[in-house]
Amino acid sequence: MSTEDEKLLKEAKKLPWEDRLGHKNWKVRNEANVDLASVFDSITDPKDPRLRDFGHLFRKTVADSNAPVQEKALDALIAFLRAADSDAGRYAKEVCDAIALKCLTGRKNTVDKAQAAFLLWVELEAVDVFLDTMEKAIKNKVAKAVVPAVDVMFQALSEFGSKVIPPKRILKMLPELFDHQDQNVRASAKGVTLELCRWIGKDPVKSILFEKMRDTMKKELEAELANVTAGAKPTRKIRSEQDKEPEAEASSDVVGDGPSEEAVADAPQEIDEYDLMDPVDILTPLEKSGFWDGVKATKWSERKEAVAELTKLASTKKIAPGDFSEICRTLKKLITDVNLAVAVEAIQAIGNLACGLRTHFSASSRFMLPVLLEKLKEKKQSVTDPLTQTLQTMYKAGCLNLVDVIEDVKTAVKNKVPLVRSSTLTWLTFCLETSNKALILKAHKEYVPLCMECLNDGTPDVRDAAFSALAAIAKSVGMRPLERSLEKLDDVRKKKLSEMIAGSGGGDQAGTSSVTVQSSVGSTATGNSDASFVRKSAASMLSGKRPAPSAQASKKVGTGKPGGGKKDGSVRNEGSKSVEPPEDVEPAEMGLEEIENRLGSLVKPETVSQLKSSVWKERLEATLALKEEIEGLQELDKSVEILVRLLCAVPGWNEKNVQVQQQVIEIITYISSTAAKFPKKCVVLCITGTSERVADIKTRASAMKCLTAFCEAVGPGFVFERLFKIMKEHKNPKVLSEGLLWMVSAVDDFGVSLLKLKDLIDFCKDVGLQSSTAATRNATIKLLGALHKFVGPDIKGFLNDVKPALLSALDTEYEKNPFEGTAAPKRVVKTSVSTSTSSGGLDSLPREDISTKITPNLLKGFESPDWKMRLESIEAVNKILEEANKRIQPTGTGELFGGLRGRLLDSNKNLVMQTLTTIGGVAAAMGPAVEKASKGILSDVLKCLGDNKKHMRECTLAALDLWLGAVHLDKMIPYIIIALTDGKMGAEGRKDLFDWLTKQLTGLSDFVDAIHLLKPASTAMTDKSADVRKAAEGCISEILRVSGQEMIEKNLKDIQGPALALVLEKVRPGFVQEPFESSKAMAGPVSKGVTKISKSTSNGTLKQGNRSRAVPTKGSSQITSVHDIAIQSQALLNTKDSNKEDRERVVVRRIKFEELRPEQIQDLENDMMKFFREDLQKRLLSPDFKKQVDGLEILQKALPSVSKEIIEVLDVLLRWFVLQFCKSNTTCLLKVLEFLPELFNTLRDEEYCMTEAEAAIFLPCLAEKLGHNIEKVREKMRELMKQIIQAYSVGKTYPYILEGLRSKNNRTRIECTDLIGYLLETCGTEIGGLLKYLNIVASLTAERDGELRKAALNTMATGYQILGADIWKYVGKLTDAQKSMIDDRFKWKAKDMEKRREGKPGEARAALRRSVRDSGPEVAEQSGDISQTVPGPLFPRQSYGISEQMLERTPVPRTIAGVNGPTDWNEALDIIMFGSPEQSVEGMKVVCHELAQASNDPEESAIDELVKDADGLVSCLANKVAKTFDVSLMGASSRSCKYVLNTLMQTFQNKKLAHAVKEGTLESLITELLLWLLDERVPRMEDGSQLLKALNVLMLKILDNADRTSSFVVLISLLRPLDPSRWPSPATAEVYAVRNQKFSDLVVKCLIKLTKLLQSTIYEVDLDRLLQSIHVYLQDLGMEEIRRRAGADDKPLRMVKTVLHELVKLRGAAIKGHLSLVPIDMRPQPIILAYIDLNLETLAAARMLTATGPVGQTHWTDSTANNPSPPANSADVQLKQELGAIFKKIGDKQTSTIGLYDLYHITKSYPKVDIFSQLQNASEAFRTYIRDGLAQVEKNAAAGRTPSSLPLSTPPPSSLALPSPDIPSLSSLDVKPLMNPRSDLYTDDIRASNMNPGVMTGTLDAIRERMKNMQLASSEPVSKPLMPTNDNLSMNQQSVPPSQMGQETVHTHPVVLPMDEKALSGLQARMERLKGGSLEHM
């Protein structure tokens, strides 16, 4: 390494960690990560505060672009995760996402370490985050990244097991991996599938996954499954379980034949397939199946079929919950149906429902149980078998429990039918056998007497069933519950019952034992075989891919590091931690001879022989000798077991001599207390004999001492557990009573942390308190009293069901042993058991799972509109807590917390208080788990402190107390910090919260996390409320006390203001900070206590400063201190950490000025301290005005060199100027006014314009202070305001000046009035909105102050000079005196103008208007009025978006772009695309000007040049629409919105430009415009109604001028539901549905407009493309959806049908020639073909077109395939038919133009066809008309004109009656209109079809009707707005009759062409002839 690198690394070590880790040099970053890893390796305490400081850094470090650095970062992360605990989970999401994104595609080492890190996150219980990340990772497009992700999931599942990694999440991810294109990914997916089979079994995996696989993959997996053995065991545990391991080992030793608890714990977790399935909704298909009609049918077969359908649907494995109450009522009736087949089907349906719904079917099961039990009377096996099966299913599925069915069983066993009684008892036996012990213990008191009574039944079957039930109870809970009842039985029955119990118990026990042994051996073998391999890859599960041997596992990345002081002494191997085999506690048999052989020379042979002696004295001597020998042994540990075995054999525990017994016990006590390790085997060998010796008063003391020694050796948990069984079964009651008394002393010595409290309490309750011996009961009471001392009152909840007398005795004992909490034990355990404390103690008290009690009805009650129902739900939760003894598990409480969270926002305050109490109760009952289970509800609880009611706040604090009792304060700190900084919380709430915190901190001696409270507490020191400040001060004192000085000094940078002085005084006594003077001076009377501190310290500071100051130079006003000189080298302004946008976001944009509040002053100080150099900020914040002037001079001198920095902190500087304006010191104010013009000149030179936020900070104050009482100050302020007007914008400045007119200061009003006159004089009246405020100025003429009246009259005179007499429109209502006064002033002004030869008032403005009207904008521009008086930023606001006409005639002049704006088209486009909103406006001005110029070019060459940029321009502007509207919604001006819309309008006014816009761009633009039309926030914006109008007009212009094909295609595509992300603002699903409905309605309106004009524009449309888009839309919907929507009257579908209908109507059969883009050969046929056929048929029937073939039998495929006739004949026929249809069109005046165009296209397509040969029977006039028409069409086609503008004459009337003989007459067809005759769309045609055949359309009535329609059409406006443009955005849709068969109503008249004079005059002439009686022949 070079010297430079070494130097760099050395220097870098001094930097903070964040700077090192983010350093630009990779070597620095690399070394930083290595150092960080070593720091974590040195941490042994998971609560070390350093871990919290570093956690957030890894998000960036693991994403490092340098591979070696990234690898080291992963090493550091692994070290961090090993050192941390589950608290590190807060960083899991962001770090895991970064690893998945950046590390999984790297080098092998990097991938391995990334996987190791993921597994450590799992170990820290961040499983959900891990799986969320994996869900994203497997969607990566790069297969190389997917394989490691799948592999790490595989490793996690393989190592931690399915208990930690939920299989359901993985099962959901696998299906998409099965079809992955990469084979490695597929192989990994298979491997994970096989691993799942090891954990949850093959059947669940098969049933869930196999149906989603391809057949080949199924076969492969089937073959692999043969090699997979179920019963996997985890090889690694999560961190919290690792802590419990020693205790788990200690408690794993049991006596007897049953399986050990450890074996149970490590056994493979039984996964219920039900939990892995997704629920299926069966209610919806059931409704559609006709079930309800079927079950009411009279025929039994129909009823059976209906129920069978339900049975079939309910056979799914998991049914979605719903309302099954009506179904169950129906089934209950059907159970008793007269037809047994129906009844059996109903019973089977109930069974299926119970199996699929489980606990959700509980209420329904209880409802139907009595009927089902009654049905047991049926003797037919076809009924009894399904009935028995259903009853058993209901119980197994958890729908019923023993407690619920007591009453129903009692009723059934008293039934008069013996079969019902016996079957009920048989079912009860089944229930008892499948229930757990706890449930039977609850219910046995009810069932035992019931069964005993049934033993006397007269029917043998009933008696046998009762015996079976009693045997089941005894088998489960033992004989104790039956003892008293057995006394009443005779010997025969007693003997029979005993035999049954013995028979069932013995057999079962043996079976269980053997099974357990086999499974244990099998699983051990499996575990051993698997343990020898480390499977890092999921693909290694597949055959032929054997994993690497475990020897390599030790080398893998992330192996555990030794940590002596951490947790249990070591950290397991991270990769594949091996589980140590449990200690063998059961001693093997060993004879005396073998013992002697093993003893060897350890004990003298004579001693052993004496121990065997029958003489007690010899035995005594031998024991004494043995004791001496043992005491002399050097290595006792190796011989412990053999010595204990010797003593147990000789003299043995049957020794009768007391002295010998005592010696034996003392020797064993000595061995157990002296040996380093005393095996549990030895305890098992001795404990029975020792417990018996406790019962003897002579040996009691030594035996108890021995038991205590055992506890010290192996832990009290193991000793207690062994004693329970011995004491319970021993015949000597003294063993029990004295053993209990020893337990009392043991609890006192060792505490309860190492005991299993649940087992101990159960033993006391079931054995001790139930004993008939008083001594035993008393000893038990003492033991429970001792437990109370450690556990507290919670123990009472577990003893509620004991007898009242015992309860009172217990209460007395509790009083003697009051709760003291956890204390240090008097004795300690030698083994590692002592380190595990988390598994015992209070937390061992049993917690109840309440998830089943949180029913949907309970949760629904929380949301009930009835407050009583909501209260009932809250009280129900309290009741559940009581029933659970206030000890609950977190399982399934997520929805409960959600319901309670909603009630915290209840309008009923009493309910909120009840909820707070309940939440506190839930927290106390749940314990530490509440922190994770509550889903952040604590933040909502804290919000309740913002209530103004004291009682509410007290309830909140009580809830916080209970919460604190459950979790530690450090878990609550993040929520408390948010609450303290919440602006909505009132002063009382903050004060109460600070007091509460102070109280909690007072009880702590050391609490590092309190440092996080320092910042919010210091902020509160500047609060307006004195109570809050006082409470915050008290809290800060406690924070400082518990945090420690080192931690405080690290965090001093976060503290400013008064709190800083307080902190420094406590941390560094005597320290004083100078800037605090300014705080005192500016904050004023904020805090009296703080002010005193500043006074007492400021004197000392000044004296000390005087000594160190240099002698001031004569004549110099600047005094430079030594400290200032020392920091001169630093930058004057530090803008490194400045974020101007964030500061401006919180600026309140007010026009009216308000004095600064103390907290605003404090914020200003804080910002100045951050950004200004120390000497500068000290001067500017000093209370001494001279220092402030000095500071300004420093800034003034540096101004040219720090202009960029000044701009960055301009808002801070302006706030300081505002502060100075509010002070009374004139010297400082004059200096400020001297500095400000220079500042604004600098800003102008930098081409910087103030932002709106900066203007809102400064201008209100400047406008208000214009009326200063010193003339000199007023003058400077006046000039400053004029300078700002020029630099900023008149349009944005004059609102502040207008606000000044409302000031209470008359001088301010005078100045503002003069400024308005100045604005009128210099800027004219073109300032948008200024004229409408002249009435305010005019009203000032009535004021008393003469100066104010004079100023108002002068301003009015200026306005009169410009406007002339028009000014009277703007003056508002005035008194006669005011009018007279103003009029006199106007006359004087007119005379004055005459003298000066300035013309007459208003003359110049009128001339300008005329010139603009006559010559366009150029003349106005040349006149100089606009260009001179309106600089760039002064563009009038109201010139946008008012109406289409206004937009068209307001082109933007070129010079309006301003001096610094863009100068050409390309530059303007760049600025629009990349500039800020303000800069974009300048670009748009140029674009508008260029467009206006190009539009006026007669040769259109300029437009042709711009066409190439049209699409790019519109695309850019479409993006700008959203941005500008978003900015305006945040409070900014709507100026940029208007410019965007105006530019778009100018673009789309030109057809060439509009046609150049591409389809994609058009879609984006239309979508954006329609969305903003619908946005309810737009009307609330500035000029919102104008913007709505502009949006409407622009939308209509787009529809008019854009490419028709693109418009149609885009709008049809927009009929689909819109993606929620496209909407401008987020909302709920319901709101999105409503929005989509409104959006589609608008799209439909647009399509209606286009469809109206289709007749005249059809040749502009690419019909092939349009039909393709309709085809795609219909195919996407599908026939099922179309049918559903047709029934629901869906508007989008109706609209598409309408467009298709219009196309078919206009083109007839020729429409089939436009299907080139539709795949007509596909199967099934495209839906569009059926609709075209239907329209052709219907329109032909309605005489709206000529049928061209057999309707409904059109062949869409190749005609040769289906038609044997030659193709030529077919083509001729088709051509003839088409010509016939065209001649019909030409014969009708309304469609003649279209017909001629069709005929023209035919002649071009078939030039050899003689069309006039078809017109032999037509009149010569008609043929001539056709010839002339074709010639005209050809001429128009050459000129590029469309049919809509074709000026053709009316066809000869006589021709209409002379169709070609080859063409069928129109009148010969039956009329069957498709739509309702009232439909506007088809009014004329249908009316014509209903007329008298003799008259037809030529009658007088028909012509009148047609004229009326034409006149209506001509009178309609050209464009109707799409949306109402006022604030009410509701759309007035016209209702459409349902008889219109799904077609959209289009209000158009297809037979009426655009109005022309010739057509109208021709009709009028015909009407005159009809009136004269000469009807034309039709």
Curated annotation (Swiss-Prot):
Biased composition (Low complexity): 510-527
Cell division is among the record's keywords: yes
One of the Pfam families matching this protein, by short name: CLASP_N
Listed result of changing residue 174 to F: In mor1-1; short and disordered microtubules at temperatures above 28 degrees Celsius
Expression by tissue: Expressed in roots, cotyledons, rosette leaves, stems, open flowers and green siliques.
PANTHER family from the UniProt entry: MICROTUBULE ASSOCIATED PROTEIN XMAP215
General function of this protein: Microtubule-binding protein that is essential for cortical microtubules organization and function. Essential for maintaining the interphase cortical array and for correct morphogenesis. Promotes rapid growth and shrinkage of microtubules and suppresses the pausing of interphase microtubules. Regulates the structure and function of microtubule arrays during mitosis and cytokinesis. Probably not required for cellulose microfibrils alignment in roots.
Name the record gives this protein: Protein MOR1
Organism of origin: Arabidopsis thaliana (Mouse-ear cress)
Top-level taxonomy: Eukaryota, Viridiplantae, Streptophyta, Embryophyta, Tracheophyta
